[in-house]
Amino acid sequence: MSKNINKTNTHLEEALSDFISKISDDSNKNTDLIAKKFLTQLEKKFNFQKKDIASIFSHLEGVNHNHPIYINKIPFISFCEHSMFPFFGEVSIAVLPDKNILGVSKFSDLVNNLSSKLTLQEKLTEEIGEKILQYLEPQGTYIKVKAKHLCSDLLSPENSIGDITTTYANGIYELDSSLRAEAALNMS
């Protein structure tokens, strides 16, 4: 199995190196090293997701807190499952706890974990909310993801668009429009 992976990586490096040579003005560049470095960094990003999501939520604390908690502007980068181009931006999370809270850095860990794969912004937004609901068991969550998609800029610059915003609500945030409005206000 390891030999097949190494062989595949070698083929990818060679193909990418050839591609870089064709699109580069500088024939003196060491395209083999550039290709290898690019693929190594890409592999690191995708391997980050291997972390078990349940381990992110292993340090729950019993708490008597019945007011919303807002975690704003967690940066992320992911890759579109349609085009493989990156999209990047910020995730904001509103959680109305029930019995448990989570350390603030754990929300960032969750976002990094779930964004380390080919996905769609809409799927990422929902998946973040669903995982928090599943593991933290809050009264509800409201998720806002604002991102820039490079596919629109690179594939069709004349039709380039600004940021795309997606939202997702579950639990009490799905039922109570005033809580959603409060969350949206705290995320701006």
Question: What role is predicted for each listed range?
Answer:
Residues 1-188:
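A domain-level signal for the structural core that forms small-molecule/cofactor-binding pockets
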